[in-house]
Amino acid sequence: AAAAVAAAAKAAAAMASSGVGVGDDRDGLLRVSGDGLELTSSAANAWAGGRAALGVSGGGCYHFELLQLSPGICRAGWSGLAAKLALGTDRQGFGFGGTGKKSFGNSFDSYGEPYGEGDILGVSLDYRDGSISYHKNGVPLGVAFTVPPPLLRQPLFPAVSLKGCSVRLNLAGPFAAAPAGALPP
């Protein structure tokens, strides 16, 4: 347990990097730090979502990470500008939640394994093959989604939905684990 706490503290220090985080594209229940990288749900029983201010498009692979700072449920992934902020509840956003479920189009399917406080979640979008995949504490969980081609023709944004927890985003690197050649969003 002490090693996990030390690793989480080291990861939090590494994630203190600058970068463009979440701005105004968020629910009223989502509190955002001054640098836009620390996000907190202000309600224990309601989802609060937000999208990063900058998206990605075109070829290549993009990756971001988050450290879950407190108990609660986090869902992280990628979304288009037209997506609901409740990530994965429409056909414009893709999420993977701490309950071990991936979501797209309001369909929740088992994937990977649960995660929570102290875990680092890596989130990758590869435009070369249209895939979204995840890492938990540096361990690849495999491909979660194949993005429909029409969505690959628009910018996609790092996105989170939180219920009763806080996370720290790392949108600039260095990353704990990322696919070879992955770039920050």
Please describe what each predicted stretch is:
Residues 1-185:
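PRY/SPRY (B30.2) beta-sandwich protein-interaction domains
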